[in-house]
């Protein structure tokens, strides 16, 4: 059209283009913040997180089953530097097992473009100190975050998970991988540490100065959810009671979210306690100790595990709802 406009209209064209660019910027920014509809709905948004989604087919299965979030185990390899979706890093040795993290992102985004958009991707970082940011950025946690920006650019939240797998002189919590995220997390990114309320609080007090309270999450549980679960009334230690205390910290603005793991298809009582008394924001579900822990797939066990969470939310629709793409855990 512009090829037929006179020069006198040039200034109007430029003004129109500038206006269009500004509108696009506003739309893009809105996509990365809580949508007005989500903000107006005061019900508690819940995240049904598919467990151990370490295959491309697992991404598809989780979305098919109604999961609005997934947990991916990520392992680093050096020379060539890369991250892959795999659970047992130490046993793999030099064998590069599992799909590349890039291919997992590709699958997540292809589903999102087809209208099947996840709300949250939780990265369980198995070896966060394996590579240094300066020496080998590609296999460092900083490099992992570089890749994860493709998810946040699409409006998908990313949670970086640190569980104390190693300890000693090279702790995961507070180590160089953890430090590489300090002061860098964007509005769609958060960091979680595993443990009791006091353990998590201590971890952030010692090593969390670069993480505002609105980016901090707490997770607690076991691959055998029955182990140490309790009944949400104990003073300390037990899973549900500690998460209940964490929910109090969240409500007071000291945490962004509380999350638990891992329920399977025959755990309705535990789902009820976690979402009801424990008031968690999300639960990892799929194969657990009862079924034998393995990668998420298109099985009835995995489908029913996610279904238990969705069913609970449906029964409590006056106070709870499933989190959607417009919801935000972090602030």
Show where each model-derived region lies:
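Secretory targeting and sorting signals
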Residues: 1-39
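Catalytic cores of phosphodiester-bond hydrolases, prominently lipid phosphodiesterases
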Residues: 41-54, 58-331
């Amino acid at each position: 059209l512009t090829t037929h406009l006179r020069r006198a209209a040039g200034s109007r064209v430029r003004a129109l283009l500038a206006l269009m660019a500004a509108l696009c910027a506003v739309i893009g920014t809105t996509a990365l913040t809580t949508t007005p509809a989500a903000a107006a709905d005061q019900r508690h948004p819940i995240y049904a997180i598919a467990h151990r989604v370490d295959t491309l087919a697992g991404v598809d299965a989780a979305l098919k089953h109604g999961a609005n979030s997934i947990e991916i185990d990520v392992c680093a390899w050096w020379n060539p530097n890369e991250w892959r979706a795999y659970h047992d890093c130490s046993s793999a040795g030099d064998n590069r097992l599992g799909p590349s993290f890039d291919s997992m992102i590709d699958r997540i985004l292809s589903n999102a473009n087809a209208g099947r958009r996840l709300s949250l991707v939780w990265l369980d970082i198995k070896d966060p100190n394996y590579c240094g940011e300066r020496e080998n950025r590609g296999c460092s946690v900083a490099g992992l975050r570089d890749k994860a920006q493709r998810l946040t650019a699409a409006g998908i939240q990313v949670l970086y998970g640190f569980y104390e797998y190693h300890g000693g002189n090279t702790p995961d919590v507070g180590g160089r991988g953890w430090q590489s995220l300090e002061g860098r997390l964007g509005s769609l990114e958060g960091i979680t540490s595993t443990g009791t309320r006091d353990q998590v609080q201590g971890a952030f007090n010692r090593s969390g100065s670069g993480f505002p309270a609105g980016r901090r999450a707490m997770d607690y549980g076991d691959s055998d959810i029955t182990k140490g679960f309790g009944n949400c009334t104990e003073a300390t230690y037990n899973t549900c009671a500690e998460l209940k205390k964490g929910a109090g910290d969240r409500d007071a603005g000291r945490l962004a979210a509380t999350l638990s793991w891992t329920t399977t298809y025959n755990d309705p009582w535990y789902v009820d306690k976690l979402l009801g008394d424990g008031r968690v924001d999300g639960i990892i579900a799929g194969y657990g100790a009862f079924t034998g822990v393995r990668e998420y797939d298109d099985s009835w066990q995995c489908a029913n595990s996610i279904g238990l969470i969705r069913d609970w939310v449906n029964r409590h629709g006056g106070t709870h709802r499933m989190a959607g793409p417009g919801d935000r855990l972090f602030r």
